[in-house]
């Protein structure tokens, strides 16, 4: 006759994180803590950190996918700040979102103004054949 709480009859399940419940990789608990400590509002609802975490995870995945494509185009296997810069500046929506953001070691987009390019000359042989 044992009177204490034993492990034999215990059917407690392991706790699941809010990130796992929402199907996210980024930490919902950490975002909730940062929202509370950041003095953004007196109270923070339970759905707000889940929503914010999912938005952050989506943005990170989008940028990393485009940067990975830029790295593959340059025949590199490692993403560097230059690839992030190319990915963000070549995407219209990301460029609008991060327009005033400076990426260290990102460089600039290759662009030569049309007036600086040499003028194309018409081929004389082609004009005589059209008549």
Swiss-Prot record:
Keywords: Acetylation, Chromosome, DNA damage, DNA repair, DNA-binding, Isopeptide bond, Methylation, Nucleosome core, Nucleus, Phosphoprotein, Ubl conjugation
Post-translational modification (record): Phosphorylated to form H2AS128ph (gamma-H2A) in response to DNA double-strand breaks (DSBs) generated by exogenous genotoxic agents and by stalled replication forks. Phosphorylation is dependent on the DNA damage checkpoint kinases MEC1/ATR and TEL1/ATM, spreads on either side of a detected DSB site and may mark the surrounding chromatin for recruitment of proteins required for DNA damage signaling and repair. Gamma-H2A is removed from the DNA prior to the strand invasion-primer extension step of the repair process and subsequently dephosphorylated.
Top-level taxon of origin: Eukaryota
Modified residues (N5-methylglutamine): 105
Disordered as annotated region, ranges: 1-22
One Pfam family of this chain: Histone
A GO CC term attached to the entry: nucleosome
Residue positions, PTM Phosphoserine: 128
Cross-link (Glycyl lysine isopeptide (Lys-Gly) (interchain with G-Cter in SUMO)): 126
Gene3D superfamilies found in the cross-reference section: Histone, subunit A
UniProt GO BP: DNA repair
Motif ([ST]-Q motif): 128-129
Cysteines paired by S-S bonds: none
PTM sites of type N6-acetyllysine: 5, 7
GO MF term set: DNA binding; protein heterodimerization activity; structural constituent of chromatin
Record PROSITE patterns: HISTONE_H2A (PS00046)
Subcellular location: Nucleus; Chromosome
Transmembrane domains' residue ranges: none
Residue(s) carrying N-acetylserine: 2
Free-text domain note: The [ST]-Q motif constitutes a recognition sequence for kinases from the PI3/PI4-kinase family.
Quaternary context: The nucleosome is a histone octamer containing two molecules each of H2A, H2B, H3 and H4 assembled in one H3-H4 heterotetramer and two H2A-H2B heterodimers. The octamer wraps approximately 147 bp of DNA.
Other facts: In contrast to vertebrates and insects, its C-terminus is not monoubiquitinated.
Known role: Core component of nucleosome which plays a central role in DNA double strand break (DSB) repair. Nucleosomes wrap and compact DNA into chromatin, limiting DNA accessibility to the cellular machineries which require DNA as a template. Histones thereby play a central role in transcription regulation, DNA repair, DNA replication and chromosomal stability. DNA accessibility is regulated via a complex set of post-translational modifications of histones, also called histone code, and nucleosome remodeling.
Assigned protein family: Belongs to the histone H2A family.
Protein name: Histone H2A.2
